[in-house]
């Protein structure tokens, strides 16, 4: 199968995808209601899209093509409200969070769609264990070579995105010690991790053809990379974030990525090399394990600093681009998180410490989702 043609798109436009938990309102465990939600929203008018995901206990919402923080907020609120209304009719709850705090993966039911059934057959129990919930952000790119340059430039900032969005400290009734335990589920897939270091689309097409010829992949969807090109959309897709507990946080993180993209592609501050990935896995682990308190190592200088410090330094550098894009309010929120060194994982742990009940913690997640 040939690689899709890269459709050039308007630079720095963006789209947001959020995978949402569907829970019952009795004990706030995951419940099978995605099909019923899809039925209820038929005929509703809203921006973007709502689609089923791999199990009946999750559903995905996505914006249209956004230009600004204000537009993203407006669309996310509108889609969220449609889903909440439908959920109320079914007496089920919706919430963010990268993992459900106490669900048992073996209870999950794969959604009845050909691709999801194929994934279940291919990956076995991993498909049900993949009931985790992420935020994906697409960034428009003017041409395919720029997309690859942006992909590898953006990889340096993966720890930022993980730490800011982290909202999955609990798995199957246990505090994992991680801020983002969700990504540990992604690691199990053979084509996860980072994209190969190629900087021209011709070289990428050659790589893709070789992979297809091995019989390992059929399309770009088979790659579970942290960032991957999406040629049919003319974007790169950043895929490492947990779903935040509110759409406001999701919009702020998306606009941080948008502003970074403008800085990286316009100013070209980085000289890219394969050596940029020497500390990639280490930095990624630190973000998952320790959140904003984690350490990140500069691959070129060896300098070590906390992820929070690196974010604050980055915000200073990209400030002119925030002004141009109208994303100052979003970046102010990002800066406040970095200064306080708190994220949604911190909030979840605080609630659990107070309530001593994961059921109550999930109930409060549902309330946060409505804010």
Curated annotation (Swiss-Prot):
Which reaction is this enzyme known to catalyze? L-cysteine + L-glutamate + ATP = gamma-L-glutamyl-L-cysteine + ADP + phosphate + H(+)
Q: Which InterPro entries match?
A: GCL_type2/YbdK_subfam, GCS2, Gln_synth/guanido_kin_cat_dom, YbdK
Name of the top EC class for this enzyme: ligase
Locate the coiled-coil region(s) and give their ranges: none
Indicate the secretion signal residues. Answer: none
Q: Which domain of life is it from?
A: Bacteria
EC number(s) stated in the UniProt entry for this protein? 6.3.2.2
Among the GO biological process terms of this entry, one is: modified amino acid biosynthetic process
| Keyword ATP-binding tagged | yes
GO-annotated molecular function? ATP binding; glutamate-cysteine ligase activity
- Alphabetically list the UniProt keywords: ATP-binding, Ligase, Nucleotide-binding
Provide the family line.
Belongs to the glutamate--cysteine ligase type 2 family. YbdK subfamily.
Q: What does this protein do?
A: ATP-dependent carboxylate-amine ligase which exhibits weak glutamate--cysteine ligase activity.
State what protein this is by name: Putative glutamate--cysteine ligase 2
